[in-house]
């Protein structure tokens, strides 16, 4: 029988719950940095964030929302978005699919001018 996984987020350590623990359906990571500086969409993958400390700002097509500790944001597939950390130290959990984790890794190792092509490979697109 599977066991629950409990991660203590006190202190400065970065901890994660990976694929093996979730049956390869999603991953949970503690992050501190901003997302891409462009509005983008994932056509087939949902994504969520839970702010642990500080402020995380989300930009959508028609609005910008500032979130603080204790706030959870769920972005279903097909919803254009981006997010960023402005100012104070921020810690948050990001809950994403294996495909989105692979996309992030690919973007981090690719020059900015090639991000559009990389996004297409992962059923995603840059909008602005």
Question: Where do the model's predicted regions map?
Answer:
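Short, charged/polar surface micro-motifs in flexible loops or helix N-caps
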Residues: 22-24, 34-36, 55-57, 64, ...
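A short glycine-rich, His/Asp/Glu-containing loop-to-beta-strand
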Residues: 3-40, 45
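Short acidic-glycine-tyrosine-enriched beta hairpin
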Residues: 48, 62-80
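Double-stranded beta-helix
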Residues: 88-128
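Short strand-coil-strand connectors
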Residues: 10, 59-63, 86
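Ligand-binding loop in jelly-roll beta-barrel domains
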Residues: 22, 69, 77-102
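A generic structural motif
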Residues: 34-36, 46, 53-55, 78-80, ...
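Short, conserved beta-strand element in jelly-roll/cupin
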Residues: 30-32, 41-59, 95
């Amino acid at each position: 029988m599977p066991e629950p996984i409990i991660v203590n987020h006190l202190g400065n350590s970065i901890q994660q719950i990976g694929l093996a623990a979730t049956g390869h359906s999603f991953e949970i990571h503690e992050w501190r940095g901003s997302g891409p500086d462009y509005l983008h969409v994932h056509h087939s993958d949902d994504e969520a964030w839970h702010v642990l400390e500080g402020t995380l700002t989300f930009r959508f097509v028609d609005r910008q929302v500032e979130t603080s500790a204790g706030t959870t944001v769920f972005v279903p597939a097909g919803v254009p978005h981006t997010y960023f950390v402005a100012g104070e130290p921020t810690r948050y959990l990001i809950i994403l699919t294996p495909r989105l984790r692979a996309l992030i890794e690919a973007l981090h190792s690719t020059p900015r001018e090639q991000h559009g092509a990389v996004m297409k490979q992962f059923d995603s697109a840059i909008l602005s």
